[in-house]
């Protein structure tokens, strides 16, 4: 297994002091020439060349008490004091990706402070993990910035799945020319099925970012869920409101039931992909991911809950 070492940009960032801010910023640019400009521009929203404004804004960002950034930074150092297990879990995930796709080059990974802006940040060369988005579902300052249903995945142990799934969505992009719900949910469901194979020691609800109760509700009501979708002929609809209702995060999936968790369409896509692989044992994971015909997958899956 190839060991991944996460770069602790967060630690260096928290060593910035107001009295020496200009020098400290220069040091950050020197030590992190690839990540620092991206963090300044994409996370803080400050033009990288505007050093005067950055020297003024950075201490405010680090010491803010209105949104709780100062308290959050201290909490982040506590929660992420030891990241050995985190690095091991991510290493395991990417080792399995490389087994499936040997050409995979593992990006450099950075742990950073996002100001509650970004759990996972990507470009072609690196991955950033917004540590302040994973301080625990019960972290008090989350009440100010997120909805209750979003807190479920704001835990340190959710990071490996978030990183690997984000990487797969980026490297295995949606290529279908169709935009029906069926196509979208099969694409996303296939990716989550693959993530579940990579982290085969995790229960399904952890992969989905749900509670165990939410997962069990879907399993117990799977037939009724499918009947609702089919009766409404939602699979073949292309309206954005329908697609977002089934695929986006939310407190529930209103298209089906107030009791159905958000992103229910992705779960259905996963279940169809799982059934497809069960009934077509000669198909490899790589072939599943490369198959862009959602109608074909649905028909050959023999999915009938």
Residue ranges of model-derived segments:
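A cross-kingdom marker for long, charged
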Residues: 2-25, 182, 186, 190-305
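Short, mixed-charge, low-aromatic patches
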Residues: 43-54, 146-153, 180-186, 222-232
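Short, solvent-exposed helix-helix connector turns and helix-capping sites enriched
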Residues: 32, 64-66, 293
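Acidic/His-rich structured neighborhood in mature extracellular/periplasmic domains
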Residues: 57-215
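Residue-level recognition of alpha-helix termini/interfacial anchor residues
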Residues: 28-39, 43, 73, 216-225, ...
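N-terminal mature-domain "stem" immediately C-terminal to a signal peptide or N-terminal signal-anchor/transmembrane
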Residues: 1-55, 59
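Short, surface-exposed, charged/polar-biased interaction segments
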Residues: 30, 49, 111, 118, ...
